[in-house]
């Protein structure tokens, strides 16, 4: 019966269910068992290279020519709104989508024309794709058995993979006996058991509730620290997941990458308005440049009657720009570093546990303040409130760079 069920599983994969088919990248990785055994996960990650890769369905282009590199051992998060092309890009790497043009390389191998099971990948999808009639240990072993691995190697790999994700005690349970977070750990263990060159994570936490999702983000970060050579392409719409996990981020919009770079750099110095607003919350004050970047590394800009110092790109006097300030960098009290000052009218106050959010109007521009500490007596809505911030916590974004 078990053999018949496993043959049925293979048939489901061939029938093309996208989520079950995604498992084939895990189960039927093309790297032979002997090759995988020689290339331990630590230090064995491969780079991924997109060379002008585009995807179209008929006349509709869903991914415009994409050129991008993911370094070995790196976590790259692709984020963007629905329909931005991020999942299409991942599925092109997996081999589920055929590029209309361009090439994809994993390591030194051009995989553009290879089927999913010959690409040496691991993949975890949103709904986990665990086989309900198999115990945890058999789900994790599925890919290895499909490769023809001997029993001893399967036992060793399953034990190692379950230990890595903290699920050793659940080896004999069925998926229905596990929580959502535990099922996701099993799915990750199954992907790791085949020692993939690259791990693809497609919205892996979106089906979990908020608390479990936060815990799983920490688990994935811990996992990558324990396997520093593992290359990960992580697709998500959740900016917090991307900011927490990724070494680099590619922000997608309308089938194009509108920004790409180190996570901290994109957050602190967004190159365009869309990045500033999509990657966390941002206050964007319209300003006019008065003087370009000086010796201290800041430009001088005017917002209404306020003269402000801003970091970022050097622009000519008279240029229109946007001064980006994150809500947590605004303060209701000044200190020696808070040399920038603006004044707004308080509209609303929202308490959210450890944070209090103040909504203000500054010369017609909505401004949010997120604070952990506030004066004992908060001003009433309608009151005039001064706000202070440091030049180093700002970034000038060109007004015409909305992308």
Describe these PLM feature segments.
Residues 1-8, 12-31, 35-37, 282, ...:
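Non-catalytic connector elements of ABC transporters
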Residues 94:
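Helix-to-loop junction immediately C-terminal to a conserved catalytic motif
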Residues 66-77, 131:
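Pre-Walker A (P-loop) beta-loop-beta motif of ABC nucleotide-binding domains
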Residues 79-81:
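The feature captures the beta-strand-to-loop junction immediately N-terminal to the Walker
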Residues 102-110:
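Conserved ABC transporter NBD signature motif
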Residues 75, 120-122, 126, 130-274:
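ABC ATPase nucleotide-binding domains
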């Amino acid at each position: 019966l078990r053999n018949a069920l496993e043959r049925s599983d293979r048939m489901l994969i061939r029938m093309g269910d996208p989520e079950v088919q995604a498992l084939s990248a895990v189960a039927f990785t093309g790297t032979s068992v002997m090759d995988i055994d020689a290339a331990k996960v630590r230090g064995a990650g491969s780079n991924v290279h997109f060379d002008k890769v585009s995807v179209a369905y008929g006349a509709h282009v869903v991914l415009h020519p994409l050129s991008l590199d993911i370094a070995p051992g790196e976590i790259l998060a692709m984020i963007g709104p629905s329909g931005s092309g991020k999942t299409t890009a991942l599925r092109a790497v997996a081999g589920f989508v055929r590029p209309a043009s361009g090439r994809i390389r994993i390591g030194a191998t051009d995989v553009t024309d290879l089927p999913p099971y010959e690409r040496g990948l691991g993949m975890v999808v949103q709904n986990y794709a665990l086989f309900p009639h198999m115990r945890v240990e058999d789900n994790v072993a599925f890919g290895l058995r499909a490769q023809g691995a001997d029993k001893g190697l399967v036992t060793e790999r399953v034990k190692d993979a379950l230990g890595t994700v903290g699920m050793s005690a659940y080896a004999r349970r069925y998926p229905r006996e596990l929580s959502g977070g535990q099922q996701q750990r099993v799915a990750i263990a199954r992907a790791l058991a085949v020692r993939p060159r690259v791990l693809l994570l497609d919205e892996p936490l979106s089906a979990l509730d908020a608390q479990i999702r936060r815990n799983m983000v920490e688990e994935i970060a811990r996992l990558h620290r324990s396997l520093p050579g593992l290359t990960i392409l992580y697709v998500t719409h959740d900016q917090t997941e991307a900011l927490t996990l990724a070494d680099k981020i590619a922000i997608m919009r309308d089938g194009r990458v509108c920004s790409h770079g180190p996570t901290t750099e994109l957050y602190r110095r967004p190159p365009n308005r869309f990045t500033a607003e999509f990657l966390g919350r941002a206050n964007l004050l319209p300003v006019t440049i008065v003087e370009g970047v000086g010796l201290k590394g800041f430009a001088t800009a005017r917002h209404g009657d306020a003269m402000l110092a801003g970091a970022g790109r050097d622009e000519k006097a008279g240029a229109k720009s946007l001064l980006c300030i994150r809500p947590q960098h605004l303060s209701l009290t000044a200190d020696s570093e808070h040399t920038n000052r603006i004044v707004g009218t308080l509209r609303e106050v929202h308490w959210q546990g450890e944070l209090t959010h103040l909504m203000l109007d500054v010369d017609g521009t909505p401004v949010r303040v997120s604070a952990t500490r506030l004066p004992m007596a908060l001003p009433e809505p309608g009151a005039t409130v001064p706000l202070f911030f440091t030049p180093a916590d700002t970034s000038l974004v060109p007004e015409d760079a909305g992308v």
